[in-house]
Curated annotation (Swiss-Prot):
Its job: Catalyzes the conversion of urocanate to 4-imidazolone-5-propionate.
Protein name: Probable urocanate hydratase
Cofactor: NAD(+)
Enzyme Commission number, as recorded: 4.2.1.49
Entry annotation: catalytic residues: 431
Reactions catalysed according to its record: 4-imidazolone-5-propanoate = trans-urocanate + H2O
Amino acid sequence: MDTPSAAAETSEPSAQWQAYRGAPTGTDIECEGWRQEAALRMLNNNLDPEVAEDPENLVVYGGTGQAARSWDAYDAILDELRTLADAETLLVQSGKPVGVFETHERAPSVLIANSNLVGNWADWEQFHELEAEGKIMYGQMTAGSWAYIGTQGIIQGTFETLAELARDHYPDNDGLRGKIVATAGLGGMGGAQPLAVTMNHGVCIAAEVDEARIDRRIETGYCMERTDDLGEAIERATAAAEAGDPYSVGVHGNAADVLEGMLDRDFVPDVVTDQTSAHDELAGYYPSGYTVADADELRDEDPDAYREASMDTMARHVAAVLAMQDAGAVAFEYGNNIRGQVAAHRGDVTTTAGESHDPFDFPGFVPAYIRPLFCRGKGPFRWVALSGNPADIHRTDRAVTELFPEKDDLHRWIDLAQEHVQFQGLPSRVCWLGYCAADDDLTERARFAVRINELVDNGEIEAPIVVTRDHLDAGSVASPNRETEAMRDGTDAVADWPILNALLNTAAGADIVSVHNGGGVGIGNSLHTNNHVVLDGSDAAAETARRVFTTDPGMGVIRHADAGYADALVEADASGVTVPMRDAEREQ
């Protein structure tokens, strides 16, 4: 079988991409309007060398998550966007433009479907065969939907998860102060972990097999130091924890080897998790016993042998996490489906202490820490300054804190982000906002979006702002091993909800709507959606914002209300969300 992403690797990078090397900036546009221009800039921002993990191969993050199927497809998308009329919609099928239709001026400019296969065919083997033939692309989540903003995109979610963990497990502590978190994976998503730990005043030891990724996180301020010596890392981390100082160190090494090395030294961290690309055993996860270069060569020459070595390492990795949990560590899976991978391919694991475990004997992060937020429609809301001017984001920082003076956590987050988070590509910001309709009937997200639109209209912001989000959101995902794990009513695998989310946001007039399969957890394991709204200062943009930022978080409320979550039912009552067929059993 050919190597994954072969279609993207067979051609040199596009001359257009080499000319751009990131998104155009400023107030001059090359498209018919700002809605089309926003799509062009967001696509190019995804492939900015400051943003993407491997832009020359169209890979944005997450192993093989691409922004376009091939360089020819990338060029064709740009060509179509430049001539796309306000009343037309471009269709993109797995990173390739396949059609333009006349619709109407408030219809989406772009509709995207990535990586979707019919149920019985939705697995990596079938996907890789089609990918090698150039017929499909892995869009991950925000890679193929042109909404990735670099590591900042996940940083607040990681920060919030760890803050909730600290509240649950160390209620009398100052966050994670004095606690050591052991983790792995410092790619585009996992690279947020060290900074999220130190923002919570803790200490982080992060294993990463690729030295370049550690160095990149240090350069961007997400990780403090690196070492090849695990003993040295443990010594530094222990000293920092005892002093109560935030600290992070990247350890060059395989995740399983590093965790087992900790156990061999009788070192048990307070918290253990990981964000390796375990969702893809062939193109994402690296097996033990190989350098990166040697593993890449094995993948090319003998993919089956690579898979076996990768799965063997994953089983050891999970066994080490469970051994640490048995020894008192707080353990959770951070959404990469490593438990599901090991359960499917290796079954139960045995720890070094001889204990047998089901890989699912430690929880996922959503049921453990995030679901109460989802019940209130709260999730990762992000916005991007198309001007390229950081001052535009700084103005929105002030706006969001002015709008929500009562939200101490939000104010703390904005302060921390301004201090610690470097912009990658177009300046951007992320914060978690929810439904929580106010007296004016606007949700939190809608209130803020309308305010941004006013700032664009009155010239306080130089150029339009794109508002988008992660696919990981309250009502936009079906992922039984992640966002919808352990749903109260057993509807973990029901995929109607993200489909309804995409349909509803299309009806509400979002400027880009996308539907993907497999992001974060691998092909066949999830279905999820994304949307963009372009705030250009117009009355039409304000109306779109009011609609989309009501329907989108509202889907989170009704999805969880339908599953019987009391918090969601309370939110529905408080905010006037209509939930038909409510009965007494639902409110128990």
